[in-house]
Regions:
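C-terminal substrate-binding subdomain of Rossmann-fold SDR/epimerase-dehydratase oxidoreductases
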Residues: 16, 56, 181, 197-312
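Residue-level signal for the nucleotide or nucleotide-sugar donor/cofactor binding architecture
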Residues: 36, 88, 96-99, 139, ...
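N-terminal Rossmann-like NAD(P)+-binding domain of SDR-like oxidoreductases, especially those catalyzing
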Residues: 1-178, 304
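Short alpha-helix within the catalytic core of nucleotide-sugar-dependent glycosyltransferases
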Residues: 34, 39, 192-193, 224, ...
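Hydrophobic aliphatic residues
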Residues: 45, 78, 108, 187, ...
Length: 312
């Protein structure tokens, strides 16, 4: 299979590229390097079956590049991925995540790709669900409360429309809180990368609010396994990719601190306005249509993440 990964120099995208190459496929990565890094591509570049294209997904040449590459599958992971930026700069967010996404989807269709697999956001497209609905499944109403979540929902709607109009196949993977090696603790990072960087630097970690807010933390290798499976299974579907388990920020901190050999507790700061209190995604449907399930425990994932940060 020949595949294109947009956002291919990023945390998840580069890990996906490595997985696809390990499976024997040819891979081209497209990335503007705004947040991605060529350092993430060293292993891929050594395979002889990899090409890197430095390009923004909003660029008008995207369709021509995809026409030249002629991929069977396009994995669209490039994004403006910071919810706070989307609130402060909604036009910029829509430019990248809606118009950029549509540019890729239309380019893939015109280039004859048999499928587009996109990274959606299970943490935002469902809005702020009632705790009694957790873990949420794919039948839950979608009422996103951030421009970022709105943009992700819009792309799902475009994919549905393109399948109806053109027969263009797709899978949309609604990701929980992804963590693991290569996540940037100084960029659009999740709390795991931030904690890892600070714990290893012997710096205090800040927890906002009382720390009892929950998230569904899913390890990056499990996530890219879902993407690889979605290239082959699941027609016109949206699947939640998470563990179904709520983990409090306090428990996450203690797990990571213990793994790092740090006895001290975190520093608590006032809660941030608008932050979701609880979140978890039901992955059962992904098990049915993709044959996927998460296999990495939080403890094992935290250890692997800390090891990577320690040795990079």
């Amino acid at each position: 299979m020949r595949a294109v990964v947009t956002g291919g120099a990023g945390f998840i995208g580069s890990t996906l590229a490595d997985r696809l190459l390990a499976d024997g496929h040819e891979v081209a990565a497209i990335d503007n390097l705004a947040t991605g890094s060529v350092a993430n591509l060293h292993g891929a570049s050594a395979t002889g079956r990899f090409e890197f294209v430095e390009l923004d997904v909003r660029d008008q040449s995207i369709p021509a590049v995809l026409e030249r590459l002629r991929p069977e599958v396009v994995f669209h992971l490039a994004a403006q991925a910071d919810v706070r930026v989307s609130v402060d700069r909604p036009l910029f967010d829509a430019d990248v995540n809606v118009l950029g996404g549509l540019n890729v989807i239309e380019g893939a269709r015109a280039a004859g790709a048999r499928k587009v697999v996109v990274a959606s956001s299970g943490g935002t497209i469902y809005g702020d669900p009632d705790p009694s609905d957790l873990p949420v499944d794919e039948t839950h109403s979608q009422h996103p409360i951030s421009p970022y979540g709105v943009a992700k929902k819009v792309i799902d709607d475009y994919l549905f429309a393109f399948r109806y109009l053109h027969g263009a196949d797709y899978a949309s993977l609604a990701l929980a809180n992804v963590y693991g090696p290569r996540q940037d603790p100084h960029g659009e990072a999740g709390v795991v990368a931030i904690f890892a960087g600070r714990l290893l630097a012997d710096e205090p970690c800040t927890v906002f609010g009382d720390g009892e807010q929950t998230r569904d933390f899913v390890y990056v290798d499990d996530v890219v396994d879902a993407f690889a499976r979605a290239a082959l299974s699941g027609e016109g579907v949206r699947c939640n990719i998470g563990t179904g388990v709520e983990t409090s920020v306090n428990l996450l901190y203690r797990t990571m601190a213990d793994a790092a050999g740090v006895a001290d507790g975190p520093v608590y700061a006032p809660a941030r306005t608008g932050e979701l209190q609880r979140s978890a995604l039901d992955p059962s449907f992904a098990g049915e249509v993709l044959g996927w399930r998460p296999t990495t425990s939080l403890t094992d994932g935290a250890l692997a993440t800390l090891d990577w940060f320690r040795n990079r």
